[in-house]
Swiss-Prot record:
The gene is rpsU. Keywords: Ribonucleoprotein, Ribosomal protein. It comes from Dictyoglomus turgidum (strain DSM 6724 / Z-1310). GO terms for cellular component: ribonucleoprotein complex; ribosome. This is Small ribosomal subunit protein bS21. InterPro entries: Ribosomal_bS21, Ribosomal_bS21_sf. Belongs to the bacterial ribosomal protein bS21 family. GO terms for molecular function: structural constituent of ribosome. The keyword Ribonucleoprotein applies. One of its GO terms (biological process) is translation. Gene3D superfamilies: Ribosomal protein S8. The keyword Cell division does not apply. It comes from the Bacteria.
């Protein structure tokens, strides 16, 4: 679970900004987006192939 503690003189906006950044670093947002809808196994394979080609 991602946790951010708000300091005494810290605004809520800056704490929220840090929280969102932490979520993005942990990969939580990407995971939520990936599970937003059903992805067929063939689509998963194609996405992974394209991703591996992109890395090369």
């Amino acid at each position: 679970m991602t946790e951010v503690r708000v300091g005494k003189d810290e605004s809520l906006d800056s704490a929220l900004k840090r929280f969102k950044k932490k979520l993005q670093e942990d990969g939580v947002l990407a995971d939520i987006r990936r599970h937003e809808y059903y992805e067929k196994p063939s689509e998963k394979r194609n996405r992974k192939k394209a991703q591996s080609k992109k890395k090369k």
